[in-house]
């Protein structure tokens, strides 16, 4: 059997007749939360039976989740072959003014998805990298993470969703399937998540950044930089030996970006390693001529890590220097500090009960095993 979520609507149209049935199937799956073909009552019975014999709609199963006191939820999913991946739901808030200028608050969500089982980039600060790469996810397995999280949390179809490819794996090391997932998510017949609300994060595969740009998908780009010298970056991120900082910056300068948007540079701040004002000065020079936004990220400690979480004062000084020199800079609001927030932590805890994430305030967090026979709500829309 094949995963129907792997199919674009054009591919599905080639498999069903008449072709308008493909649109109906897409609407059931992406807009009405159907998880079984038997729920698609406007399809002929024989077609439903035929589809059920050839395809499945549930590429993953949630085996555990942890909910933080800040509302973020980390999920551990099991794939059909028994391998496990992680995804995260980050509830946000945005302010919207009505016609009278009165501000009302509306929830919005960011979903962080994995693109691979494991990762071969070998970043020193990343728990996922310690296990190496097992395999790429298919487009349907990537899309399935978003579908499951939206369905489980009863997020309305119309509600704004941002997708970030920042979970387990290097997205550009699985560019074929990631680019297909981007296109499937953007289809109006499906979830209609615009590419401009999808961000691909990379450790800096220069040649793949170029390929992604040539695809002209309209997605946003985020670069995991984390250091301002090649010596330190090579220590933290072995990929720097193949694509050094200069090569990454050259690739970024050639990447097509919406004039209203900026390239995001993610900078993981590690105590006494890359958190000085001197580092900030070097970063300003590196970003010269690039329409950039820097996102400072607190290092999330985990058991066995040699690195420490930076002080708030260091973060603020770093941010202040960048802003004073014309670089847009934010400090990422730390979410999930009371759960296994760092990439790979929940998977590691599930597989190794002796492992403990170095987190605080665990009494506020909620951890649950998910039953395997969850009933899924199907929208009546």
From Swiss-Prot:
GO CC aspect terms: cytoplasm
Domain of life: Bacteria
Cofactor list: [4Fe-4S] cluster
InterPro entries xrefs: Aldolase_TIM, Methyltransferase_A, RlmN_N, RNA_MTrfase_RlmN, rRNA_lsu_MTrfase_RlmN/Cfr, rSAM
Active site: 86, 343
Positions of the UniProt region annotated as Disordered: 351-381
Transmembrane residue ranges: none
Sequence positions that bind [4Fe-4S] cluster: 119, 123, 126
GO biological process: rRNA base methylation; tRNA methylation
Enzyme Commission number(s): 2.1.1.192
Remarks, miscellaneous: Reaction proceeds by a ping-pong mechanism involving intermediate methylation of a conserved cysteine residue.
HAMAP family the UniProt entry points to: RNA_methyltr_RlmN
Protein family (similarity comment): Belongs to the radical SAM superfamily. RlmN family.
Protein name stated in the entry: Dual-specificity RNA methyltransferase RlmN
Species, as recorded: Campylobacter concisus (strain 13826)
């Amino acid at each position: 059997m094949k995963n129907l979520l792997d199919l674009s609507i054009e591919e599905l149209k080639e498999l069903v007749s008449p072709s308008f049935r493909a649109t109906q199937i897409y609407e059931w799956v992406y807009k009405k939360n159907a998880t079984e073909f038997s729920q698609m009552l406007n399809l002929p019975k024989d077609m439903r039976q035929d589809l059920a014999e050839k395809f499945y709609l549930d590429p993953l199963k949630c085996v555990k989740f942890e909910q933080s006191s800040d509302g973020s939820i980390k999920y551990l999913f099991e794939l059909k072959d028994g391998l496990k991946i992680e995804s995260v739901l980050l509830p946000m808030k945005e302010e919207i003014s009505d016609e009278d200028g009165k501000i009302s608050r509306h929830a919005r969500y960011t979903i962080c998805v994995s693109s691979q089982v494991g990762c071969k980039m070998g970043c020193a600060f990343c728990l996922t990298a310690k296990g190496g790469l097992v395999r790429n996810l298919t487009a349907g397995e990537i899309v399935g993470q978003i579908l499951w999280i939206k369905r489980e949390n009863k997020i309305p179809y119309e509600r704004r969703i941002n997708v970030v490819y920042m979970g387990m794996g290097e997205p550009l090391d699985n560019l074929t399937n990631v680019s297909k997932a981007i296109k499937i998510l953007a289809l109006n017949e499906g979830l209609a998540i615009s590419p401009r609300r999808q961000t691909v994060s990379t450790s800096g595969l220069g040649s793949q950044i170029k390929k992604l740009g040539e695809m002209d998908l309209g997605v946003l780009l985020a670069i995991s930089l984390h250091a301002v010298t090649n010596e330190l970056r090579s220590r933290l991120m072995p990929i720097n030996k193949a694509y050094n900082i200069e090569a990454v910056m050259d690739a970024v300068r050639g990447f097509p970006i919406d004039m209203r948007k900026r390239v995001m540079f993610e900078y993981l701040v590690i105590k006494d390693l890359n958190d000085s004002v001197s580092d900030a000065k070097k970063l300003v020079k590196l970003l010269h001529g690039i329409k950039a936004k820097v996102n400072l990220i607190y290092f999330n400690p985990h058991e066995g890590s040699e690195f420490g979480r930076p002080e708030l004062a260091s973060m603020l000084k770093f941010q202040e220097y960048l802003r004073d020199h014309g670089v847009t800079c934010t400090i990422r609001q730390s979410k999930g500090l009371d759960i296994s927030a760092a990439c790979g932590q929940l998977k590691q805890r599930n597989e190794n009960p002796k492992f403990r994430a170095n987190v605080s305030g665990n009494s506020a967090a909620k951890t649950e095993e998910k039953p395997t026979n969850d009933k899924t709500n199907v929208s009546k829309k």
